[in-house]
Amino acid sequence: MPNFDAHTPMMKQYLTIKAENPDILLFYRMGDFYEMFYDDAKKAAALLDISLTKRGQSAGRPIPMAGVPYHAVEGYLAKLVQLGESVAICEQIGDPAASKGPVERKIVRIVTPGTVSDENLLPERQDNLLVAVYQEKDRFGLASLDMSSGRFQIAEAENAETLHAELQRLQPAELLYSEDFSEMAIIEQTKGLRRRPIWEFELGTAVQLLNRQFGTKDLKAFGVEKAVLGLCAAGCLFQYAKETQRTALPHIKSISLVQNSDTVQLDAATRRNLELTRNLSGGTENTLASVLDKCVTPMGSRLLKRWIHQPIRKIQKLRQRQQTIAAILQDDLIDELQPLLRQVGDMERILARVALRTARPRDLTRLRTALEQLPQLQQIIKTLQNLTALSQPMGEFAELCDLLQRAIIDSPPLLIRDGGVIAPGYHAELDEWRSLADGATQYLADLERRERESTGIDTLKIGYNAVHGYYIQISQGQAHNAPMHYVRRQTLKNAERYIIPELKTYEDKVLKAKGAALALEKQLYEEIFDQLLPHLAALQLSSMTLAELDVLTNLAERAETLNYVCPEFSPEIGVEIQNGRHPVVEQVLKEPFIANPVCLNPQRRLLVITGPNMGGKSTYMRQTALITLMAYMGGFVPAERAVIGPIDRIFTRIGASDDLASGRSTFMVEMTEMANILHQATADSLVLIDEIGRGTSTYDGLSLAWACAEWLAKKLRSLTLFATHYFELTVLPEQFAGTANVHLDALEHDNTIAFMHAVQDGAASKSYGLAVAALAGVPQQVIKLAKQKLAQLEKLSAQSADQKLQDLRTLHQMQGELALMEEDDGKNAALEMLEKLDPDELSPKQALAYLYQLKTLL
């Protein structure tokens, strides 16, 4: 501990408390302000755009100081949290009047980006997650906690790519990682990074902490006991949550394991390329969520986004969702359910604040309003067979609703410290104290009248302020007429203020009554928490059910408004879509969207898609993935009909840009994403590949594109949409069974081009690249020059086209002869020999000898 003897007592206290939390900002309460000193002051001044001043000297040096008013602190905290900062709140807990030295202070809570629960500090319609990651060799454990709902989950990742995908799904507000974590490239761009000591990830400690929290002997009931790496991460996360909240966390009642086998897996590139909740620019406009999310409650909106990012594979559960949506549509219940659900509000987060005992008076009135909707909602859902499963978990809570109706006034003040929250008639003693305090108005009016009459001073009036209490005010012109027993309390420019014994006695009596009323009111407010907490688990289950009902009602409204249909699930591998539409693009276009079919099945697994730039290839592929994903959410889809078979993963390799932060070129990004697909995809995967091989030479790119397509078609047998400008690949259907050509066409006339956007069988005839360049505004002289060059190149190309195709076919035959794609039982001897050879070190004679030797091995 540093020596603080050279400092004043107050600064000693500050520095001692600051030493306990050196890495975060300390808001140190002094009267009506939270003050910051030294480096904290400099940092806060820069981040919050507040004045940096100085406070005297300590240890012979000026002390940098910055401060914010206590009554406006939430706005400043919100800004700091958004910037990824954490703040320790240090309050005065001692009585200034009874303190000989500095008033006793202590840290009452630590506000961090991942543990906030105050509604002013939280993004309303997205989850705010605290996440911890733990690494053991090449495997990873993850834990996530939503402090504002109590949802606590763990998962395990078999490799760095899966970890990246999970972090992309979770989008943590704050991320804890161990000191020995080695994959920093994955997490270094995350806000709110917190490095934690290795011992916090110890398994035994984690299990002990979690059992104590849940009141269990072991974790078998939660199905997580074998997820060791996930539990290690959970232990660190839970310790951090306890450390920052400094109170019990009764709303965290369970922990669950996220199983990859239960969900359709989406890697990080797929989540980004499909623009599920964020567009490619990082905004929320023109995303799938922006189209689908018309939920009337914030908690419903958050749940819908979880469904979007984590589509499920349990067909029974999916059909239940579909049936509920269909029932809501059939009985025309949208207009009945949504007004009631809108009144429910954000019950989930209110309950978290109740659990933490930080709920404000208006939280309790909103909870009361939510509970008041339950009888009507129950009446509606009990009449429909497909909705009755929601009835029991929703509950009614008539007693709690009655408690809140009796206890809290209709429009309470913002904070309990303002008083006037508890309703009249709820508590007799409180009513008595209030009556005494409120009687001051009539008494003061009578006293003012008497004093005017007795003194003859017509400007005399009685007033009150927080500094001087009650006073008698007389104008300066008549102050000389004040009686002798008037004791001067304050002199103003135009008036004098006095006190008399009778008024002082009454002031003491009123202030005592107000103080007693406020103290009793705070006590009663805490007792309301005591009565709510035993029902917390049931209330949380109710809020989850209401959020689900909101999502399903919302999806019904979207299906009706946007003309969606219910997809069918088939046990047969494939994706068949009749007149499918892109759910986002069709909302943005001013002209009608051109719907297109998709047919993928065991006999037609890979479609080679050709056509012009801007012709709609990328849109066609994305809409196929989005329709599939929407089906596995349990919602309806934009098509005339959709039959979806088993899908375990969705991969996309669409578009790319340089990853400057990691020092990777466009081509390197493409190849990294492609490598992930080739390693991870299965026969049940849906794969979208767009323009692979563009970032290198023509022959390199063509070779890579051919090899990737062949691997997908023959080895992986994934359901694949493969868009390309390499027309040489249109011969693939001649080479491999299960492969077909489709194209999108355009019409060119008088230097203009019209894109048809309709998918047709067969290969495209040309790419229309020059017409697109002209549309983009490339100067006509350049276009003219390009056309001349194109004519020359096409003439040369025509002469060698047959030879090029023959070369590709020959290459394919050679690959077959070399058994390049034989079963994974090891490489043959010829390939092993080739791998060991260094051509640069061979003489011509040695090379010829090796060639003969290789010939004998084939």
From Swiss-Prot:
InterPro entries noted in UniProt: DNA_mismatch_repair_MutS, DNA_mismatch_repair_MutS-lik_N, DNA_mismatch_repair_MutS/MSH, DNA_mismatch_repair_MutS_C, DNA_mismatch_repair_MutS_clamp, DNA_mismatch_repair_MutS_core, DNA_mismatch_repair_MutS_N, DNA_mismatch_repair_MutS_sf
Name the record gives this protein: DNA mismatch repair protein MutS
GO CC annotations, alphabetized: cytosol
Binding positions (ATP): G611, P612, N613, M614, G615, G616, K617, S618
Keywords in alphabetical order: ATP-binding, DNA damage, DNA repair, DNA-binding, Nucleotide-binding
Keyword Nucleotide-binding listed: yes
Any one Gene Ontology BP term: mismatch repair
